[in-house]
Amino acid sequence: MHAAVIGGGPAGLMAAEVLARAGVAVTVYDQMPSLGRKFLLAGRGGLNLTHSEDLERLLGRYGDAPPLLRKVIEAFPPDALRTWSEALGQPTFVGSSGRVFPKDFKTSPLLRAWLRRLSEMGVQVRLRH
């Protein structure tokens, strides 16, 4: 089986990673000359990855969130995101606001590590498509 992921932003890259882990051959297509450009732009203001509050309180921030949103967040809660980042060699910390940040406040090392992992998993990339 082969999957095409359209868009190389965080959602597309995570989709590619999940599919590749499941044994699917993946190609990521993006119209830009490199992946993760908006991710890098978001980091200019100090990228917060998630929030450290407990899951029910976090979900409460979404009001009457659709059941699908609840299932998605429960499947990949904030602690799992922190573990994922740390497995990429990018430790995190909780700021005074409760938000979780990369320890060095930079997105580029996180993105490079993520792209390296995807490459090692066999994910193919087609840019300017």
Regions found by a protein language model. Give the residues of each.
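Glycine-rich active-site loop/strand segments that organize a redox cofactor
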Residues: 46-94
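Glycine-rich FAD pyrophosphate-binding loop
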Residues: 4, 20-44
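Glycine-rich NAD(P) Rossmann-fold beta1-alpha1 loop
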Residues: 9
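Short, hinge-like loop/turn segments at secondary-structure boundaries
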Residues: 43-48, 111-112
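Feature captures the FAD/FMN-dependent oxidoreductase FAD-binding
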Residues: 74-129
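N-terminal Rossmann-fold NAD(P) dinucleotide-binding loop
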Residues: 12-13
